[in-house]
Amino acid sequence: MGAFTEKQEALVSSSFEAFKANIPQYSVVFYNSILEKAPAAKDLFSFLANGVDPTNPKLTGHAEKLFALVRDSAGQLKTNGTVVADAALVSIHAQKAVTDPQFVVVKEALLKTIKEAVGGNWSDELSSAWEVAYDELAAAIKKA
């Protein structure tokens, strides 16, 4: 991978703001997308026990945290050229034995959600910036 550019970081940051503009709606898009592709993922998220409920603060809080982590990864990539995952984040993913295919499902759901959040501003360049930031975060979680 080449250096993560200032433009890529700006694309991720600005589209994150579009996501934040309606977290309840986009949280539903995100988790429904995950559950459509991998219904068993419901067991990985305690707050999905009763389905996808946009009024559940744990659901919206987790979605916001995950998208913020990817945004922060973009910042780390721009500044340091690498992503360092938080030890607690690494621990929970190891404890739940999250697999490579599950990381892919989350990535696809993340991209679908951002695409919906930004509407007509979606582009290959925007998609690529989110993909790189997510992939580097996932790699940091898996290798730690």
From Swiss-Prot:
Q: How is it modified after translation?
A: Nitrated mainly at Tyr-31 and, to a lower extent, at Tyr-26 and Tyr-134, in effective nodules and particularly in hypoxic conditions; this mechanism may play a protective role in the symbiosis by buffering toxic peroxynitrite NO(2)(-). Nitration level decrease during nodule senescence. Phosphorylation at Ser-46 disrupts the molecular environment of its porphyrin ring oxygen binding pocket, thus leading to a reduced oxygen consumption and to the delivery of oxygen O(2) to symbiosomes.
> Where does this polypeptide localize?
Cytoplasm, Cytosol; Nucleus
GO CC terms of this entry = cytosol; nucleus
Q: Give the Globin domain ranges.
A: 3-144
- Identify the residues that bind heme b: S46, K65, H93, K96
Binding annotation for O2: H62
InterPro entries in the cross-refs: Globin (IPR000971), Globin-like_sf (IPR009050), Globin/Proto (IPR012292), Leghaemoglobin-like (IPR001032), Leghaemoglobin_Fe_BS (IPR019824)
Which superkingdom? Eukaryota
Q: Which residues does this entry mark as bearing Nitrated tyrosine?
A: Y26, Y31, Y134
Intrachain disulfide bonds: none
Q: Which residues carry this modification: Phosphoserine?
A: S46
Main subcellular localisation: cytoplasm
Report, as the record phrases it, the tissue specificity of this protein: Specifically expressed in root nodules, and barely in pods.
Keyword terms:
Acetylation, Cytoplasm, Heme, Iron, Metal-binding, Nitration, Nitrogen fixation, Nodulation, Nucleus, Oxygen transport, Phosphoprotein, Transport
Induction is noted as: Negatively regulated by cobalt (Co) in a dose-dependent manner. Suppressed by exposure to excess nitrogen (N); this repression is associated with nodule greening and reduced biological nitrogen fixation (BN) efficiency.
**Further remarks about this protein from its record:** Five leghemoglobin genes have been isolated. This sequence is tentatively identified as C1.
Q: How does it assemble?
A: Monomer.
> What role is this protein assigned?
Leghemoglobin that reversibly binds oxygen O(2) through a pentacoordinated heme iron. In root nodules, facilitates the diffusion of oxygen to the bacteroids while preventing the bacterial nitrogenase from being inactivated by buffering dioxygen, nitric oxide and carbon monoxide, and promoting the formation of reactive oxygen species (ROS, e.g. H(2)O(2)). This role is essential for symbiotic nitrogen fixation (SNF).
Protein family according to the UniProt entry: Belongs to the plant globin family.
Entry protein name: Leghemoglobin 2
Q: Which organism is it from?
A: Glycine max (Soybean)
The UniProt gene name for this protein comes to: LB2
